């Protein structure tokens, strides 16, 4: 059967159906024909407003962090462009870190997440435990085998933090990655941790 215009049900052959002309609340739809008005560019989307594309340059997805990129409408589409991030390795947080997959992982923030707001990163000497490759102190794990850190990689194993008067503190749990320095964390100038 042919579509019946004005039922508020989108049927085959209709571009829109917003009900009767007196009840229609969709400015893009011609309620008498159930077709979109000829001037309509879009009906919905982050970059669509009053049936027209929002002009180019209007931000549709704000920057969430220093390693994220704000997206703006193109003026040619109702959709916000694909979410994009800064390239990996871009310096961030005043050169304390490098962007990694849209984040700026630094040890200081990881210590705060593990111990609380007063936590700081322990002195370099604490990280030497990662040279042992014993127990919880290592750089890499493959199944049951653990691999010690090389001297230049000691800051890519277990994370050591100071909390109030205590130093060389670390955390661990059943999750083997818990308490380890996060991948992408700056460990030296021009170098980041990578568990692979």
Swiss-Prot record:
Disulfide bonds join 5-34, 16-29, 18-24, 28-51, 42-48, 47-73, 60-80, 67-99, 92-104, 111-161, 126-168, 139-149, 156-193. It comes from the Eukaryota. Expressed by the venom gland. Transmembrane segments: none annotated. PROSITE patterns: DISINTEGRIN_1, DISINTEGRIN_2. GO terms for biological process: proteolysis. It is an enzyme of class 3 (hydrolase). It is found in: Secreted. One of its GO terms (cellular component) is plasma membrane. Its cofactor is Zn(2+). Gene3D superfamilies: Disintegrin domain. Keywords: Calcium, Cell adhesion impairing toxin, Disulfide bond, Glycoprotein, Hemostasis impairing toxin, Hydrolase, Metal-binding, Metalloprotease, Platelet aggregation inhibiting toxin, Protease, Secreted, Toxin, Zinc. Glycosylated. Residues 2-88 form the Disintegrin domain. Belongs to the venom metalloproteinase (M12B) family. P-III subfamily. P-IIIa sub-subfamily. The hemorrhagic metalloproteinase-disintegrin-like bothrojarin-1 is a potent inhibitor of collagen-induced platelet aggregation by blockage of alpha-2/beta-1 (ITGA2/ITGB1) integrin. It does not present any fibrinogen-clotting activity. One of its GO terms (molecular function) is metal ion binding. Monomer. This is Zinc metalloproteinase-disintegrin-like bothrojarin-3.
């Amino acid at each position: 059967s042919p579509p019946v215009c004005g039922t508020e049900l989108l049927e085959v052959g209709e571009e829109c159906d917003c009900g009767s002309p007196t009840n229609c609340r969709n400015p893009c739809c011609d309620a008498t024909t159930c077709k979109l008005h000829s001037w309509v560019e879009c009906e919905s989307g982050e970059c669509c407003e009053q049936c027209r594309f929002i002009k180019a340059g209007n931000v549709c997805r704000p920057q969430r962090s220093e390693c994220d990129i704000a997206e703006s409408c193109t003026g040619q589409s109702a959709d916000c462009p694909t979410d994009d991030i800064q390239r990996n390795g871009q310096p961030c947080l005043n050169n304390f870190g490098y962007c990694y997959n849209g984040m700026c992982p630094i040890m200081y923030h990881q210590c705060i997440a593990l111990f609380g707001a007063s936590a700081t990163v322990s002195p370099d000497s604490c990280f030497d435990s990662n040279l042992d490759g014993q127990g919880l102190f290592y750089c890499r794990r493959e199944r049951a085998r653990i691999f010690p850190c090389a001297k230049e990689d000691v800051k890519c194993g277990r994370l050591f933090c100071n909390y109030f008067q205590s130093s060389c503190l670390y955390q661990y749990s059943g999750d083997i990655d818990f308490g380890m320095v996060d991948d992408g964390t700056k460990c030296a100038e021009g170098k980041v941790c990578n568990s692979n």
